[in-house]
Amino acid sequence: MPVKSTARKKLSRATRRDLDTRIEFMEGIVRRDPDYVDALQLLGDDYTQRGRFPEGLQVDERLASLEPKNSLVFYNLACSYSLTRQFDRAVAALEKALRLGYRDFAWLAKDPDLKKLRAQPAYRSLKEKIQRLKKKAG
């Protein structure tokens, strides 16, 4: 499963180089096996860390088609939509993630990838749903 990461961290030159090398490697794997979910997850995370949000979004959309019942895939898709300023789509993906069982409310509240989304009016109604789910979870 991918790690929680954010593209907001300033990356050192060595880290950028390592990420670029890993991206190139993972792109090769995905070219050979376009349905390799684990490779796609790593590639999407690396694109996001590197600030390559449109490419990360393409990967997350691909993952959503391959893993339609995976709550974390839809959470990451919401992050990609938020990072590309597609806020209505981000809300829809986040709603689906919650319907599928995503429950890491603490991370959702502070994830920097969703910062701009949380400032949007569309997020308000979703915030109410999140509060109800938190109460239910106990």
Region roles according to the model:
Residues 1-28, 138:
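Long, contiguous interaction/recruitment modules in multidomain scaffold/adaptor proteins
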Residues 88-105, 128-135:
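TPR/TPR-like (Sel1-like) alpha-helical repeat modules
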Residues 11-15, 27-85:
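Alpha-helical adaptor scaffolds
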Residues 10-19, 103-129:
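TPR/TPR-like alpha-solenoid helical repeat scaffolds
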Residues 39, 71-72, 114-125, 133-138:
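Accessory recognition modules or surfaces
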Residues 71-72, 100-110, 137-138:
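Boundary/linker segments of alpha-helical solenoid repeat arrays
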